[in-house]
């Protein structure tokens, strides 16, 4: 499969930064920074995300989140604390397992996508395309499904094969394979 942050798999704690240290750095940057974006891996995996978002908001910062939407119940709880979300939508619902290798992952991701749109917060849906996984038919199905859901902001980005976990995909050239025009 593909992951933008393969260095975070498996999840490591050896280089963890104390939350107090993060807050101290942000205190020093008040007036210089507008927002704090929680990224990952998958930030909604972290039980401390909700209180962290609240603390950041209480400091006066806007908040952002990068997510693949795999935990809709957790996402629903934090959406009121989010100003913007970058949402990695990998495929149309019926094609999700092909991309993720995880059964029912499409149901969860698309439920989260629906929650994002219904919330009214600013968002960007994005899909990383590797031509051997997501062909033009699958990409078109994905774009249509997003449109039917009400999505208006969608970005297609080319896969950086150095982040592929699958050795065959890692050695496949995507240089001359721009995503198809929809």
Please name every model-derived segment.
Residues 41:
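Short, charge-patterned binding micro-sites
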Residues 21-35, 44-169:
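Conserved AdoMet/S-adenosylmethionine-binding subsite of the radical SAM
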Residues 1-17:
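Canonical Radical SAM [4Fe-4S] cluster-binding loop centered on the CxxxCxxC motif
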Residues 167-182:
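Short, basic/aromatic-enriched C-terminal tail that caps enzymatic domains
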Residues 12-19, 102, 106, 174-178:
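Flexible, glycine- and charge-enriched loops at secondary-structure boundaries
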């Amino acid at each position: 499969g593909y992951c933008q942050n393969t260095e975070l798999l498996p999840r490591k704690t050896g280089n963890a930064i104390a939350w107090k240290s993060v807050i101290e750095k942000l205190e020093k940057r008040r007036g210089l920074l507008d927002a704090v974006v929680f990224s990952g891996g998958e930030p909604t995996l972290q039980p401390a995300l909700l209180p962290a978002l609240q603390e950041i908001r209480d400091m006066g910062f806007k908040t952002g989140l990068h997510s693949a939407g795999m935990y809709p119940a957790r996402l629903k709880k934090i959406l009121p604390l989010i100003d913007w979300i970058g949402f990695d939508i990998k495929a149309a619902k019926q094609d999700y397992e092909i991309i993720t290798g995880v059964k029912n992952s499409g149901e969860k991701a698309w439920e989260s996508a629906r929650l994002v749109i219904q919330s009214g917060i600013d968002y960007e849906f994005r899909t990383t395309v590797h031509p051997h996984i997501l062909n033009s038919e699958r990409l078109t199905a994905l774009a249509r499904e997003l449109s039917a859901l009400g999505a208006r902001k969608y970005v297609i980005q080319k896969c950086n094969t150095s982040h592929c976990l699958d050795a065959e995909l890692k050695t496949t050239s995507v240089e001359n394979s721009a995503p198809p025009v929809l």
